[in-house]
């Protein structure tokens, strides 16, 4: 019985996921959030600046299931459409991907500038320390920048190569 219980521990560990996203300001490395828009830190490389600019263009648009998949510029975005939009702008992705595909995208672990938290049914990004998500909890839905913490249970933590 003891041996059988040990076999389940690795399976359960995969359900937990990485540590929750918690905002931490690092001077010169973290984007600043002002009036719902992100300001890139001075040291950010061009792909990160491009991702932030793309996020600012779609921030505040409504949530729309399937939004951002047929057109990179759309009237509304779902989580994977929004994540795809930013990664396309950064030159890290060709076309849109569904949430579950981000679980094997890029490289494992957190990135220096961009991190991807992907479950089968949801994905969000952390770009220069700010969370870009389509909502969590009881707040507004749709693409937006946030410094609010959120759980990451069941997420795979990935990042674009080199970022």
Task: Annotate the PLM regions.
Residues 15-62, 138-163:
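Intrinsically disordered, low-complexity
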Residues 49-52, 84, 88-163:
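...with weaker cross-activation on analogous glycine-rich loops/strands in unrelated enzymes
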Residues 4-14:
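Bacterial N-terminal signal peptides
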Residues 10, 77, 112:
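Structured loop/turn residues at beta-strand edges in well-structured enzyme cores
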Residues 56-76:
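Active-site nucleophile-His-acid catalytic modules used for acyl/amide transfer and hydrolysis
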Residues 71-90:
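Active-site nucleophilic cysteine motif
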């Amino acid at each position: 019985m003891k041996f059988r219980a040990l076999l389940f521990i690795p399976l359960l560990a995969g359900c937990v996921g990485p540590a929750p996203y918690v905002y931490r300001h690092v001077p010169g490395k973290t984007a600043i959030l002002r009036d719902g828009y992100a300001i890139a830190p001075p040291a950010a490389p061009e792909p990160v600046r491009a991702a932030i600019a793309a996020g600012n263009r779609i921030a505040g648009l409504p949530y729309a299931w399937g939004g951002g998949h047929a057109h990179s510029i759309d009237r509304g975005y779902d989580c994977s459409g929004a994540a795809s939009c930013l990664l396309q702008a950064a030159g890290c992705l060709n076309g849109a991907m569904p949430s579950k595909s981000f679980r094997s995208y890029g490289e494992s672990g957190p990135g220096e500038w961009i991190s991807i938290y992907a479950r089968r049914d949801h994905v969000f990004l952390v770009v220069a320390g700010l969370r870009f998500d389509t909502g969590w909890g009881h707040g507004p839905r749709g693409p937006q920048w946030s410094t609010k913490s959120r759980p990451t249970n069941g997420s795979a933590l990935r990042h674009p190569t080199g970022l």
